[in-house]
């Protein structure tokens, strides 16, 4: 009888897993279908046949102007946007597009995170893809939107292109947990060496140490891609006041998806616990 119960339990567990997988699959594909319909109908509404006459260069210029104007029209633009990928499948080109669009609307800092550390292990590949998409999307004006990838724990850059206007930081779970541990150890040493007393240690002191270790401001906005309802260790201390917006997938994400999220952020009122 026990073996029968075990078989039934395993069957129900497998059935639940299958149901979740099917629901997730339908969510992503319905979202992509909606995007395909928009992509099909929007050019007709905007008179896309007239845009073709301008050619690739004219198209890039018009897009660059539009994206810059979009950023200026927002009532509130985040200084730092985090791109949190919870999906197992990662597309570098789609993430690079999101980074370039963030640069184009005027966002100064972009952090890229996945809980497996894939981006961090392959940050050179990510940088190459960003530079490629920068040229593809912005054309000759791409030099106005220079980017650098910051090394963790230093003020030096791994890559730099002309004068930097936007900074990209590639993060993994270690950056969240390890930075808290290191800050705590530093405070303990200060007390042990009588440089501080236990009464001197408070939230503000710890917060200052953690900000110094990151070289960039706390994220104002995090875009979470995927169906996982968790931030998966993304800078746990630094996102206490961060607005988090969930999106179905980073795969095939469009500029309009990003801009819609920025509009939602601009309309949010932070009450800071009030």
Curated annotation (Swiss-Prot):
The chain crosses the membrane at residues 1-23, 33-49, 95-113. The keyword Magnesium applies. Its EC number is 2.5.1.87. The keyword NAD does not apply. Pfam families: Prenyltransf (PF01255). One of its GO terms (cellular component) is dehydrodolichyl diphosphate synthase complex. Glycans are attached at residue 122. Its cofactor is Mg(2+). This is Dehydrodolichyl diphosphate synthase complex subunit nus1. It comes from Danio rerio. The gene is nus1.
């Amino acid at each position: 009888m026990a073996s029968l119960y075990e078989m039934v339990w395993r069957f129900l567990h497998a059935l639940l897993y299958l149901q979740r997988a099917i629901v997730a699959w339908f969510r992503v594909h319905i979202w992509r279908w909606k995007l395909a319909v928009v992509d099909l109908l929007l050019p007709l509404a905007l008179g896309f046949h007239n845009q073709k006459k301008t050619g690739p260069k004219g198209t890039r210029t018009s897009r660059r102007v539009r994206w810059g104007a979009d950023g200026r029209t927002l009532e509130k633009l985040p200084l730092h946007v985090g791109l949190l990928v919870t999906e197992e499948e990662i597309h570098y080109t789609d993430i690079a597009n999101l980074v370039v669009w963030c640069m184009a609307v005027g966002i100064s800092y972009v952090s890229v995170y996945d809980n497996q550390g894939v981006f961090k292990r392959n940050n050179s590949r990510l940088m190459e893809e960003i530079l490629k998409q920068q040229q593809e999307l912005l054309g000759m004006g791409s030099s106005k939107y220079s980017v650098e990838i910051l090394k963790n724990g230093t003020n030096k850059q791994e890559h730099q292109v002309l004068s930097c206007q936007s900074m990209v930081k590639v993060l993994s779970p270690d950056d969240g947990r390890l930075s808290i541990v290191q800050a705590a150890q530093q405070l303990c040493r200060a007390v042990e060496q009588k440089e501080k007393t236990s009464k001197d240690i408070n939230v503000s002191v710890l917060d200052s140490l953690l900000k110094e270790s990151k070289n960039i401001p706390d994220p104002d906005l995090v875009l979470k891609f995927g169906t996982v309802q968790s931030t998966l260790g993304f800078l746990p201390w630094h996102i206490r006041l961060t607005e988090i917006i969930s999106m179905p997938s980073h795969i095939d994400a469009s500029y309009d998806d990003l801009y819609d999220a920025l509009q939602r952020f601009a309309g949010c009122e932070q009450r800071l616990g009030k």
